[in-house]
């Protein structure tokens, strides 16, 4: 790696960490403010089902024998895998669990059901960046049928072999769920988690990277990932093109050595930066929380006033863009995406009915042990989730019009919402019986009515979610340059006493969401 490329990487890393630091401190302050306002206003949830506490059921989610490829000897070994309630995965020599061999945390990973293809695709992609003739590249060794790849580009990858197709399909979904639900953050404070995500988004936006970006892991890993992603986008191609002309295996070896150096440079900068930033916000919170609590009403009123001023001053820029690029497509989009979403939520209610009618316990907490975990089962929830599957191709058809969204993420998020509603439905019935002391028959009727209400609400919410995910990145590329001068003017008008607790960009983001939600609701009402 020459000195110029190395210096570019150092400067980019430094600039991104500086941007993230500023964005995170601001976002963390805003999240504490939001929490204080929410606590003071005691705004009720629109959903009627009780949200299931994360640790309500600590029983294992799933288990079974699989064959795992060893990291060092590269031999296939039979192991007993256990998915814990927090979606970490332990694996043992056998099902007696006396000899634990390791733990896998899949936060930030992806699941590939055809590792032979995905592995070759990655090699070809790298070869193209290095200017290598792809016809000269030897194909990698073929993995056995029913092999699953648990992939991360900068962490250890896992290769898991299943016994048959049915087992393969089941574990694919289990591993995908673990990727989505396992927690990588070391700091579990909700304000921190929300602020971190906003800071990641805003850091990427500051570089003009408007599209969807999936991430996961602990704080250091995520910060390293977003920097490495930008290095790959902006610098890596030029660095790889400067490698000496040589056979593929030599160039690939040099490329891997280069990536090891780059990853080391980034991680060595990220670790102390995050340690210092984390300490700063820990010291900040006890100082600002009392100030926020004393000014909840003025802050909330100022936020409302600013959003109203934004709407008044910016609609002349936003409305034409909505008419030209969004509104003319909404009726068709909603008409097409509505059926699979409705069907998915409706099917989840049918499953709840079946499982609830099958419950014949005595109403004790212990009698619900099997019932409360029914949403864990892939095959039990499959009929509801499968109803969402047609949505993927529908959403993909709009890529020529809207870009920078993930059809996979959209579909998977809705499937997760359906599954979470099933958890809440099971928990609500159990709580109504065991804590509220309502008889089982009456509790079933009460919970059924709540579930019906939430199915309608959940469908509506997910329609709006899909529209936002598809449309917003493209819309923001158009309207942000037009609205930026007005944002700057409004920002300068915020009273200094509460300026630290108001993020003009987040309020603008809320305004855009509100506009898209309102437009979507108009079409939903027309179609009803």
Curated annotation (Swiss-Prot):
InterPro entries xrefs: Niban-like, PH-like_dom_sf, PH_domain
Ranges for domain PH: 59-180
Family annotation (Pfam families): PH
Domain of life: Eukaryota
Name recorded for this polypeptide: PH domain-containing protein DDB_G0267786
Organism: Dictyostelium discoideum
């Amino acid at each position: 790696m020459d000195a110029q490329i190395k210096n570019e990487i150092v400067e980019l890393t430094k600039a991104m960490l500086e941007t993230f630091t500023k964005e995170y401190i601001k976002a963390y302050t805003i999240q504490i403010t939001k929490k204080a306002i929410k606590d003071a206003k005691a705004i009720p949830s629109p959903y009627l089902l009780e949200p299931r506490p994360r640790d309500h059921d600590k029983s294992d989610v799933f288990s079974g024998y699989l064959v795992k490829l060893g990291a060092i000897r590269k031999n296939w070994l039979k192991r007993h895998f256990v998915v814990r309630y927090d979606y970490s995965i332990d694996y043992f020599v056998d099902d007696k669990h006396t000899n634990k061999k390791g733990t896998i945390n899949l936060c930030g990973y992806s699941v590939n059901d055809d590792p032979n293809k995905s592995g070759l695709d990655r090699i070809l992609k790298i070869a193209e960046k290095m200017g290598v003739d792809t016809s000269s590249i030897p194909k990698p060794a073929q993995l056995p049928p029913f092999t699953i790849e648990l992939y991360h580009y900068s962490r250890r990858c896992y290769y898991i072999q299943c016994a048959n197709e049915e087992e393969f399909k089941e574990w694919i979904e289990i591993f995908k769920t673990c990727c989505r639900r396992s927690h990588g953050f070391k700091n579990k404070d909700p304000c921190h988690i929300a602020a971190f995500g906003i800071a990641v988004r805003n850091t990427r936006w500051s570089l003009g990277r408007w599209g969807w970006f999936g991430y996961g892991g602990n704080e250091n890993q995520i910060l390293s990932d977003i920097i490495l992603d930008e290095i790959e986008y902006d610098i890596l191609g030029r660095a790889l093109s400067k490698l000496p002309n040589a056979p593929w295996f030599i160039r690939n070896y040099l490329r891997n050595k280069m990536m090891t150096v780059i990853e080391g440079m980034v991680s060595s900068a990220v670790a102390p930066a995050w340690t210092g930033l984390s300490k700063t916000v820990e010291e900040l919170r006890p100082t600002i929380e009392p100030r926020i609590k004393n000014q909840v009403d003025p802050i909330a009123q100022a936020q409302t006033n600013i959003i109203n001023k934004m709407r008044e001053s910016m609609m002349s820029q936003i409305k034409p863009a909505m008419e030209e690029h969004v509104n003319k497509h909404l009726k068709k989009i909603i008409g097409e995406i509505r059926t699979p979403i409705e069907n998915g939520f409706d099917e989840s209610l049918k499953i709840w009915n079946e499982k609830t009618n099958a419950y014949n316990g005595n109403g004790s907490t212990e009698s619900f042990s099997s019932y409360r975990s029914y949403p864990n089962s892939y095959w039990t929830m499959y009929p509801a989730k499968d109803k969402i599957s047609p949505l993927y191709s529908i959403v993909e058809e709009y890529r020529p019009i809207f870009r920078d969204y993930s059809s996979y993420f959209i579909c998977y998020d809705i499937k997760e919402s359906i599954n979470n509603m099933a958890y809440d439905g099971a928990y609500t019935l159990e709580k109504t019986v065991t804590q509220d002391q309502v008889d089982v028959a009456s509790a079933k009727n009460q919970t059924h009515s709540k579930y019906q209400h939430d199915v309608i609400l959940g469908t509506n919410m997910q329609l709006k979610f899909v529209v936002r995910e598809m449309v917003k990145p493209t819309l923001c590329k158009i309207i942000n340059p037009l609205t930026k001068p007005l944002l700057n003017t409004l920002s300068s008008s915020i009273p200094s006493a509460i300026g630290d607790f108001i993020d003009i960009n987040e309020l603008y983001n809320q305004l855009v969401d509100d506009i898209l939600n309102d437009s979507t609701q108009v079409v939903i009402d027309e179609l009803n």
